Amino acid sequence: MNKFFTYILLSLSLISLTGCNDINNSKSQIPENTNNTIEDKIMDEDLTSDNLSKNNNLTLIDYSNFKDLGINKDNVTLKINGHDLDFNLPIYLDKNRYYFSLNEIIHNLNGTFTKDEDCLYLNIHDEIYSINLLDNTIHCPNKEFKLKKDLLNSENIYYICFSDLSNMLDLYTRWDKDNKIINCKINSSQYINDTSSKVNNDNYKNNSLNNELEDKNNSTSASSKNTQIGLIRFEDVCVTSQGYDKNYFENLRIIGEYMNEQNIPYHIAWIPRYKNPNFKIDNDPLTKNNFEIAEMVYTLDYLKNNNGIIGLHGYTHQFGNYESAAGFEFGKFEPSTDVFKEKIEKAIETASYLDIPIDFFEVPHYEITPEQNKIAEKYFKILYYPFNDYGVDKADLKKPQLSPYNNSSLYISTPLDYIAEGKEDICLDRIKKSDISNMGSVFFHPSLENAFISLNEDSDGYPSFNYADNSILKRLVTILKENGFKITKVTEL
């Protein structure tokens, strides 16, 4: 009898266990919702801010087990929200990109950092971020993006490229090269939207704006009929090491953020290697790995993330003892096809080494021979300058011009030319009255905005700025819109 009851109990236990397995199996067969957000994932796995610390907390790791990554180290101070971050682990600088210990950053920000299978979860200021280690996707509270550079990992200590950290936390950054300090403010988009205050500038009074407003009604009928494209290119972007360019890249990032907020695409004509032989300056990113060039690379990453299109503007944009951006590089000043090919390949090599995506080529000062053009076409689909091989007056101003050589590459003119320093009002008036049957294609030197951008620091040590509404660029954008140009990207032509 006892044996019988024992048998019954064993049978019931087996049925019970089988039932649990069937339930678990049935759950595993339920298809996952591929549209789940990070918030859904957090709720599904109970990864709320209260429970994150119960998982594998990577902020409490023993750093003594850290194995050096074998990358060039650098001493730099990182400030976030007014506080210097304290690092026990090295800061790395690889190919002019900084890498910081993500574990220590989260610890410094009083956050939590946990790992669950193939995902990292970060809780910063009660905001949850996740990094999928399988596909390098970062999920933020308000966006999702792919890592620019892979995380570096040693014994569950993760290093993140500063460009990716900035993109994730939406940082506004100020780079102090004299003291090697990067001063940051989290959630910059919430902070820098208040950019409407005027910067006093005696050279540009409101009468210029008033004149433009008076002409607005006159341009309305013309703009409604205009179907032409508009193109904006920021010219001669490079790292000069000159004192007058101290705030150059910060101002450029402010400009890029403004353009992105206005949903206006723009182009960056980048000079990869700046040379100034008279001052013995040669900023070659292939041979130099430093704070100054790192800010340039960071800025190019930032602009790419903010609706910018990057292209090569020659290699050094100079020859002989001339300074980059001022000197010529090709054409009648250097007609050699061998030199041209060598420099083009060096420019491409530099961009590839720095992992900067390139979408067009612009020859310096539009000076190039027909034979050099034929070589350029082998490397680039978009040649962002007029096709003058049959004469300057033969360049197509109304549309991109298909190459007669390879029937593939496109040459793009700039009929609106550029805005000359000291003649800003005259140039803007010329553009306002331009022939709208031509492309609204113009190039612009970012330094013209310096007088309209004021950089500040508040009482808590947060970097801030004001960007005047009556700036040259903002007036240019207004004119292009009022003339009806549809501002686009060369990659969409």
Task: For every predicted segment, state its role.
Residues 21-23:
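Bacterial signal peptide processing site
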Residues 25-230:
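Primary recognition of N-terminal secretory signal peptides and signal-anchoring hydrophobic helices
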Residues 383-400, 447-493:
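C-terminal domain-boundary segment and adjacent tail
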Residues 285-292, 358-451, 455:
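Active-site-adjacent pocket scaffolds in enzyme catalytic domains
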Residues 16-19:
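C-terminal motif of bacterial Sec signal peptides marking the signal peptidase cleavage site
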